[in-house]
């Protein structure tokens, strides 16, 4: 029970921070463009606490702490863009009610480039948050740098077949610089059944080896049962935590975030092409389990209060940065309802000089919503299966 509560608190904290920053991105961009804002809510449902600032914005903390939203004046249906007839009717109503000058304060009457800027500001805020948090981690704690020297080649594995030898120093994988053994593991994990060209230093010279990772199933304490690519290499002993300087922290963190974005895009591409098993897709249950497992691990292993505090700060920062990158990327996908879907509609409007017709928007919205809900249900099924929930329930009746 305590473990579940830790998981729940960690999940709600991390998710609230990431989503609030995402919505603040939309909020600050809208303010910069002179858009009237009606409400900023942390969470959904009935407001528990609310107040108005001097600009008339209602700030709320709502009863369901899973997400949040910002609502602009006249944006009752935030999922779509009004068509020309709706815009004309809305403009006339605003003029009648508030006067001609008020029209320009409404989101839908801003130039299309400003609306696109407001839409993209949410994901960009997530990426900026991740960069700042990773920078703090790199300065305060550092990054683990394990040796890229091969300590052992497991017999009968792809690494053995490719000709790896103990003592080889791995320099590059597919011309990508390798900085630690974790880089190798992360790169290989997503490339099962894909040949990888390794540049290896051996006896003072560089040789190239081609190895194709095999797909294996592993039980992971944090992620549960996962299928990953594996070569059969083990690193040589040795490693250290290397801190970034204040000057290099932001560039180093930016590289970290960019690498994560490329990894997510590559993983999604392989999934869509059927090159990776779809049962590896994870959702909110998986995120919660990861948050709980990481936090529980810190609580159980900390020898004293100081170590516990440091471990909790590090783990929650790491979770916030990682989830922030994922949410920022996923929101840029060109699916109606998401920010990326709005950007597609604005691109059409910029080219056609008019918004997409309302019936097409409605159809796109329904299709996008169905796609997202279907994805969430499928991901939840995978998570429950990965953590053997169905096996446990079945055992109750046998």
UniProtKB/Swiss-Prot annotation:
It is a multi-pass membrane protein. Gene3D superfamilies: 2.30.42.10. Keywords: Cell cycle, Cell division, Cell inner membrane, Cell membrane, Differentiation, Hydrolase, Membrane, Metal-binding, Metalloprotease, Protease, Transmembrane, Transmembrane helix, Zinc. The chain crosses the membrane at residues 117-139, 316-338, 362-381. One of its GO terms (biological process) is cell differentiation. Residues 130-203 form the PDZ domain. Involved in the regulated intramembrane proteolysis (RIP) of the short isoform of PodJ protein (PodJS), during the swarmer-to-stalked transition. The cleavage occurs near or within the single transmembrane of PodJS thereby releasing the N-terminal segment into the cytoplasm for subsequent degradation. It contributes to preserve asymmetry in the next cell cycle through sequential degradation. Degradation of PodJS is not regulated by cyclic variation of MmpA level. This is Metalloprotease MmpA.
């Amino acid at each position: 029970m305590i473990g579940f509560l830790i998981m729940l608190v960690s999940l709600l904290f991390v998710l609230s921070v990431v989503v609030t920053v995402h919505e603040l991105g939309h909020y600050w961009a809208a303010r910069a463009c002179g858009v009237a804002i009606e409400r900023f809510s942390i969470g959904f449902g009935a407001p528990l606490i609310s107040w108005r600032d001097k600009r008339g914005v209602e700030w709320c903390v709502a009863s369901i702490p899973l997400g949040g939203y910002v609502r602009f004046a006249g944006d009752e249906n935030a999922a779509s863009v009004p068509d020309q007839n709706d815009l004309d009717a809305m403009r006339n109503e605003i003029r009648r009610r508030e006067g001609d000058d008020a029209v320009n304060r409404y989101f839908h009457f801003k130039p299309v480039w400003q609306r696109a800027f407001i839409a993209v500001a949410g994901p960009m805020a997530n990426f900026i948050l991740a960069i700042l948090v990773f920078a703090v981690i790199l300065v305060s704690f550092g990054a683990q740098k394990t040796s890229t020297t091969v300590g052992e080649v497991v017999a009968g594995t792809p690494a053995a077949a490719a000709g790896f030898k103990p003592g080889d120093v791995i320099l590059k994988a597919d011309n990508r610089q390798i900085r630690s053994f974790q880089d190798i593991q992360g790169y290989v994990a997503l490339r099962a059944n894909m040949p990888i060209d390794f540049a290896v230093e051996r006896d003072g010279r560089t040789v190239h080896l081609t190895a194709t990772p095999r797909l294996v199933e592993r039980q992971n304490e944090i992620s549960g049962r996962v299928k990953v690519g594996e070569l059969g290499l083990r690193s040589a002993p040795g490693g250290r935590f290397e801190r970034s300087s204040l000057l290099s922290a932001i560039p180093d963190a930016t590289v970290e975030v960019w690498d994560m974005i490329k990894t997510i895009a590559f993983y999604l591409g392989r999934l869509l092409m059927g090159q990776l098993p779809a049962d590896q897709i994870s959702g909110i249950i998986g995120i919660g389990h990861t948050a709980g497992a990481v936090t529980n691990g810190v609580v159980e292993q900390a020898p004293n209060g100081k170590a516990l505090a440091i471990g909790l700060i590090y783990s929650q920062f790491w979770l916030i940065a990682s989830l922030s990158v994922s949410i920022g990327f996923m929101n840029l996908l060109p699916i109606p309802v998401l920010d990326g879907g709005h950007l597609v509609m604005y691109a059409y409007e910029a080219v056609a000089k008019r918004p997409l017709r309302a019936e097409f928007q409605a159809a796109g919205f329904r299709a996008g919503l169905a796609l997202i809900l279907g994805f969430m249900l499928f991901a939840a099924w995978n998570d429950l299966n990965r953590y053997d929930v169905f096996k446990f329930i079945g055992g109750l009746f046998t």
